[in-house]
Amino acid sequence: MFPTVPDQILAELARTEGGPDALGLLVRDQDTRRLLVLRAVLDAAEAAGPTVCDAGRKARLREDWAMLADADAATAAADPVQGTVTERALPGVERALPGVERALPGAGRALPGVERPLTPARARLFHPLTGPWARSCLRGLDAGRGTPAEARSLRRDLAHFSAVAAVAAAAAGLPFATRLTARAGVLTLPSLGALHTAASGDVPVDVTHRDGVLTIRQPDAPDVRVHLENGTGAWSGAPAWTPAHALPGLLPSAPPMPLDDLDPYREPPYSTHRGSLSGAATLDDAERKRWLQAWNGTAVALRSGGAHRLTEAAALLRCLVPLEMPPEIGTGRGSCSATRREAFGALLSSTPPDPVTFAATLVHELQHAKLAALTDLVTLHRAGPEARYFAPWRPDPRPYDGLLQGTYSHLAMASYYQRRALLTRPPERDWAWAQHARYHAQVGAALPALVGSPDLTVPGRRFVDEMAATYQRMADHPAPRDHTARAQAYVKSARALWTQRRASALPRPNE
């Protein structure tokens, strides 16, 4: 079911690059895996006992899946290419739930550069934040009968699928009438917006759709009419409605980029204050304007680091999730960012201060997404989880996989800033050389541990060797000596401090 990775593509990715074939392979595989996770959710719900998922909820899941299939069929039938993709449905997904006769089509997606948008149903299921929702469902269903709070969380998770199906059906132009459930006083319709209900709890909300207009009815409140827009967002004159927002497409021909500050699954379920990573933000108009100002120059800044940086961002990035600015960073002095393995295509970031900084953030984070997607297809190493490796960018020891991830992203950053330094003028050039020298020195300090590992597989050896060759080729255009000296001194100091901390953490003799 899963494709093999040709040596040429493995080499491209090891160089932190990747053409349309390489990126298309990763994207299609991640979409395939998303369908399999959804299948696992539906199977787990069917297998769950009545105290975990009762007959009514199972029936509703079947109805929601059928609505998604109807939405997909309605739009795929109007597009011969989409219809062809339908013929390549995943084996075993044809009957994802008993009683549902049609499968959602497989994970077909046009290669980067081919303007073939997903159907509304596929767009919702392959949306990055559907991944965390599915994982949350699986955790709840696999846990069995839990506490009242856990049971309520699972009910909310399963109810969210109804909203996903309704959005897909509305986007496909299908008329319908359905009952949804608001969560803690908020009904979120992914990609459209959110309704703040009159009641503050989990309340039923009746939603009908006809001719591009949703009518939302709730107890003790006037009806709300919401008008769908093409793409992301929907508008209404009701003060209770908050529309979803999007930024312009990264490329002129690209669809708008969702800036999602509404989805209930946009931040991890565990503590969001991991180091300098903050929690999800809800933006006001001023913050959205700052996002737009940074975003408008991001494509140019990406291209200055190589055309492939813009290509990979256009191919891999599906939504942006705003984060709060950590207090230790401060406005205008940087940002925090992350990716989530279960949310392929999402980039979490605080408000970027400028286009160049945000372009660098994209380069850095998309390498994590690329490498995570690649390792779903190829086993690169068999090292254990023990944290014992020095990484110049971290104060703590790293496991081998963490060192590989960090070195890979830093290698891309070294390449990005070297290309910028060779293209830009002072003072941008001097800044780019300083950044390149720092990343290059950090990669040089980390590579020996990666290359020397006996835990590398055959493809892993090829991958790491190509990383090392890419690092060495950068010496053809070295940074000025003063930048190189400062970068090497920084790494030397970081290693000395790391060694000192490690020594103090070890038990003394006879203790």
Indicate where each model-derived feature is located.
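Post-HEXXH active-site segment of zinc metalloproteases
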Residues: E342, P352-T361, A369-D401
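Alpha-helical phosphate/pyrophosphate-handling elements in metalloenzyme active cores
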Residues: L348-S349
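Long amphipathic alpha-helical segments
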Residues: Q367-T379, M413-A414, Q418, L422
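Type-3 copper protein
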Residues: M1-V321, R438-E511
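A short, terminal or domain-edge coil/loop segment
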Residues: L371-R382, E386, R429-A441, A479-V491
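Metalloprotease/metallohydrolase-associated module, dominated by Zn2+-dependent proteases
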Residues: T282-D285, L292, T298-R340, P352-P353, ...
